[in-house]
Amino acid sequence: MKRDSGQKLPHVTTRRLLDMKEQGEKIAMLTAYDYTTARILDRSGVDVILVGDSVSNVFSGHNTTLPITIEEMIYHAKAVVRGVQAETSRSMVVIDMPFMSYQLSSEEALRNAGKIMKDNECDAVKMEGGKVVVDTVKRITDVGIPVMGHLGLIPQSIYKFGSYKVRAREQKEAEELLRDAVLLEQAGAFALVLEKIPADLAAEVTRTVGIPTIGIGAGSFCDGQVLVINDMLGLNTEFHPRFVRRYADLDGVIFDAVTGYVDDVRNGQFPAEDESY
């Protein structure tokens, strides 16, 4: 779908996401980590752009999300916000709070959430976890900072669980996740990411809570969907889980373009006369 980059649509807010849930309008969310990609996503009609701590993997080359720092997250967030502002300024921008930026205490979490919000013009922060972060979520939302929750597979706890397998298959774990979803809503979270959980459980959570659910590997019954931009564009050829649909093969496109450039340079075919001054 082609969209007019000059079209000024209302900025997506937490209220708008609630309206979308109530009206049955699906929410489209993608990650971005840089200015150029954010411009394209905003122009393309993406509702929510997540500056995810997945930048640790796909941008910095780490094996997990744990090494990324709050300073690095803010750096990428600033670039994304500038990209959105350069286009239609429609997309909501949500920033992941990185590992150990909110786990030590509610006071430190509040300080770091405030730093993220003050250092760039983002719309909200995202935090992983259930009951263990509920008090912190309430503390942060009470001062006016919107928080998106994240349940199911929570990558910041990968060493605790030991794998990236589907979560909450067993009844006890499913019941706990459902309770956590309700607790997060009561604490003031405006939306929930549900990652790698059974589709029927995601549907139950979506029916139970009044806030939007955004799935990744959680079936089609969620109020919206999110993917890592590198995965859906085919930039990460080694990673192709069941829940990722590839909409392009940019790895191949970039490879062909670069090898073509290298050949032209080595053969003396670039630059041509009309590419010179």
Curated annotation (Swiss-Prot):
Alphabetized UniProt keyword annotations: Cytoplasm, Magnesium, Metal-binding, Pantothenate biosynthesis, Transferase
Positions contributing to Mg(2+) binding: 53, 96, 128
Cofactor(s), names only, from the UniProt record: Mg(2+)
Reaction(s) this enzyme catalyzes, per UniProt: 3-methyl-2-oxobutanoate + (6R)-5,10-methylene-5,6,7,8-tetrahydrofolate + H2O = 2-dehydropantoate + (6S)-5,6,7,8-tetrahydrofolate
EC number of this enzyme: 2.1.2.11
Enzyme class (EC, first level): transferase
Major subcellular site: cytoplasm
GO biological process: pantothenate biosynthetic process
Pfam hit, one: Pantoate_transf
Listed pathway(s): Cofactor biosynthesis; (R)-pantothenate biosynthesis; (R)-pantoate from 3-methyl-2-oxobutanoate: step 1/2
Similarity comment: family membership: Belongs to the PanB family.
HAMAP family assigned to the protein according to its UniProt record, in alphabetical order: PanB
Protein name per Swiss-Prot or TrEMBL: 3-methyl-2-oxobutanoate hydroxymethyltransferase
Source organism per UniProt: Chlorobium phaeobacteroides (strain BS1)
